[in-house]
A protein has these predicted regions:
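Helicase motor interdomain insertion/brace
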Residues: 1-169
Length: 169
């Protein structure tokens, strides 16, 4: 059992506010786009909560994708949005990579994403990620008990982050 440090707790509270705002905005869209927006917001929460590295990667992908996609035409973007939400999406085997962003975001969202990234970097720099520290304690206990632990992570970025943390500590 672990408790989030204040910096992480505040980040998650800010993220939840962003998600609530996104859900309110989605109410004005058609059902297909609403569904996409909900999946996108859920993926964002999962990424940020998985690890600082997964969150940073996802947020940076959203910023970069939206910068690159500004030149694309609307039909191409809409086609990608709806393809992303095929009913079989959950059966895909590559749920271990951070999803790419398909929704266009405005400059205020980009600023917010950059603020989230800065906070996630601050969490890493201050060693304020209690979840990875708890994982380290469990791995140490397992190793000291003669076991060979395997740590499963949802995202590749999280697996690399946890692996690096364990090796360094």
């Amino acid at each position: 059992e672990y408790a989030f440090k204040p910096i992480y707790r505040n980040l998650l509270a800010d993220l939840m506010e962003y998600v609530k705002t996104g859900i309110k905005r989605a109410c004005n869209e058609d059902r297909r786009k609403q569904r996409y927006i909900y999946w996108d917001l859920l993926a964002l929460m999962r990424g940020v909560m998985s690890s600082p590295d997964a969150g940073i990667s996802m947020l940076q992908n959203k910023i970069d994708k939206n910068t690159d996609s500004s030149a694309q035409n609307t039909d191409d973007t809409e086609e990608k949005i709806y393809t992303f939400n095929e009913p079989l999406k959950d059966l895909l085997t590559n749920d271990d990579v951070v999803p790419e962003a398909l929704e266009r975001v405005d400059n205020s969202d980009k600023r917010k994403f950059r603020d989230f990234i800065k906070t996630l970097n601050d969490i890493k720099a201050a060693d304020s990620d209690e979840k990875v520290r708890q994982a380290l304690d469990i791995v140490r206990f397992s190793l000291n008990s003669g076991m060979n632990p395997i740590v499963f992570c949802q995202y590749i970025q999280t697996a690399e982050y946890v692996g690096k943390y364990i090796v360094e500590h």
